[in-house]
């Protein structure tokens, strides 16, 4: 089940725009059915896969941020198949930052989710310390 909305895609694009401005790269937003959100392009060539997670709170609201295990697996599979690194791009109300998919593997896993989606709303997630997500 795809739970991504038009609002989600707009928020992801805004996060990618900030990333592009900071690093002088291009981020191509991939189709919603693709396993990750975007591909970073450097000097006209693919350089990395990006999964975007937009939060509606400030970065200091919680000590950790969730990275879905299946998203990290997809990023690592793409990295293994292509050689392009996979990364998570987190955006909060007050800041944004990135962390590599490889680094996420070192953190504890919990089961977390949204009760408003019923049983389909829960999944295993890595508990990534917010302080480890760097600009």
Language-model segments: residues:
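Mg2+/Mn2+-dependent nuclease catalytic core
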Residues: 55-74, 78
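Intrinsically disordered, low-complexity terminal regions enriched in charged/polar residues
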Residues: 97-135
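Short acidic/glycine-enriched loop/turn segments that link adjacent beta-strands
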Residues: 32-36, 94-95
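Amphipathic coiled-coil/heptad-repeat helices and related helical stalk/stem segments
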Residues: 12, 34, 68-71
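Nucleic-acid nuclease catalytic cores
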Residues: 76-104
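A structural signal for short, well-ordered beta-strand segments and their strand-loop junctions
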Residues: 29, 49, 86-90
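Conserved catalytic cores of phosphodiester-cleaving nucleases, focusing on short active-site segments
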Residues: 38-58
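Acidic-basic catalytic patches of nuclease active cores, encompassing PD-(D/E)XK
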Residues: 1-32
């Amino acid at each position: 089940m795809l739970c991504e909305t038009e609002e989600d895609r707009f928020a992801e694009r805004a996060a990618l725009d900030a990333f592009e401005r900071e690093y002088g790269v291009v981020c191509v937003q991939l189709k919603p059915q693709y396993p990750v959100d975007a591909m970073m392009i450097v000097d006209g060539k693919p350089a990395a896969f990006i999964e975007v997670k937009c939060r509606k709170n400030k970065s200091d609201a919680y000590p950790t941020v969730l990275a879905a295990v299946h998203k990290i697996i997809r990023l690592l599979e793409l990295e293994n198949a292509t050689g392009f690194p996979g990364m998570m791009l987190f955006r909060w109300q007050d800041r944004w930052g990135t962390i590599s998919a490889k680094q996420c593997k070192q953190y504890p896993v919990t089961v977390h989710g949204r009760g408003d989606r019923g049983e389909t709303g829960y999944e295993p997630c890595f508990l990534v310390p917010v302080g480890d997500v760097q600009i």
